[in-house]
Structure formats: structure tokens, C-alpha cells
């Protein structure tokens, strides 16, 4: 299990899609990241700045901007997103992620 040390955690969760996706802001060395949980379902998100998403548990499919085919990302894999784009996530089981803002 990977552990993030010396982390500050926001106490209030970000809750999306009627609680089916939740995340918390964390601060590592002053850099904001979010850790989150995705319950089964399909969800569309938008970015405001470049992001790197790392799947930390389970897996989910992602429809990246400009793509027509879903791609599966399993635990330990990452994908990058530009600012001001939309993308979709489809999960069949519970999955977790770490989002780093680039």
C-alpha cells in the first residue's frame, strides 16, 4: 500500500453524482491533489487545469477527449488531461484515484 506522508487533508468532501463519486483535497508539500472514490456508474467530468489521474485501486474505463473508444485503466496506471476538456469515466466496481494538478 502506498502511503502519502506529511499530508494536510480538507475535512469536507467533494460530493458528485448523488454521492456516487466523492473526493477530498489533500496538500502534499503545498501542492493540491485530490483522492477519490468512484462507485459503479458512468460519469462526465470537466477540467479547469491540466491533470494527471492515477488509478489507486480497482479499475475503470475512460473516454478521453476527442476519442471514440473507451480505454481501461487499472490500478497503478495513469492518464493525463489538458485544461478545459471533458472526459467520461465508467466503473463496474468501486475504484479509487489520485488526481494531481499539473
Swiss-Prot record:
The gene is ppnP. GO terms for cellular component: cytosol. It comes from the Bacteria. Pfam families: Ppnp (PF06865). Its EC number is 2.4.2.1, 2.4.2.2. SUPFAM superfamilies: RmlC-like cupins (SSF51182). Belongs to the nucleoside phosphorylase PpnP family. Transmembrane segments: none annotated. It is an enzyme of class 2 (transferase). CDD domains: cupin_PpnP-like. One of its GO terms (molecular function) is thymidine phosphorylase activity. Keywords: Glycosyltransferase, Transferase. This is Pyrimidine/purine nucleoside phosphorylase.
